[in-house]
Amino acid sequence: MLRIAVTGIPGIGKSTVVAKAAEKLADQPGFKIGGIQTAEIRKEGQREGFSIMDLATGKTGVLGSIRESGPRVGKYHVNLEDLEKIGANALRSAMDCDLIVIDEVGTMELKSEAFVSAVKVVLESDKPVLAVLHRSSSHQLVQRMRREFEVLVVNEKNRDGLPGKIANRFREMR
């Protein structure tokens, strides 16, 4: 079973690499992708937070925002309700998929025990996984994933070619 994680400095394009790789795989007939994807929420050019989306259903919510209440990570407040209703549920319901995407296992997501538990369920399965890992987290779950996954560091030189390389690796696995 193939498990790949991407990591790198903030803003380098980790989520973009994973999204583009997943897009390439989704073009294959009968290839079902589940899990979660995050994206920036911007207003007038300023980042105000992050959204979270269930890849199977398209359901979207707010992961963190400068306008929310909840546990604080930097200037953002984590929306535990959406993280658990959308994020944790998406991971639990992705067990019938050909690939589970987890974007991201980072500081905000790790504030939710339900999310951590859902990631552990995925890790205990035999499912292929493509994940984004926080670059410097010392959290036990992130450290486990670093040990168990092939970890690719995204940088300016490799980020354009990585989506195709990652997609090809998962295609070869089928």
UniProtKB/Swiss-Prot annotation:
It is an enzyme of class 3 (hydrolase). Its EC number is 3.6.1.15. Keywords: ATP-binding, Hydrolase, Nucleotide-binding. One of its GO terms (molecular function) is ATP binding. Gene3D superfamilies: P-loop containing nucleotide triphosphate hydrolases. ATP binds at residues 8-15, 99-106. NCBIfam families: PRK13695.1. HAMAP family: NTPase_1. This is Nucleoside-triphosphatase THEP1. It comes from Methanosarcina barkeri (strain Fusaro / DSM 804). The lineage of its organism: Archaea, Methanobacteriati, Methanobacteriota, Stenosarchaea group, Methanomicrobia.
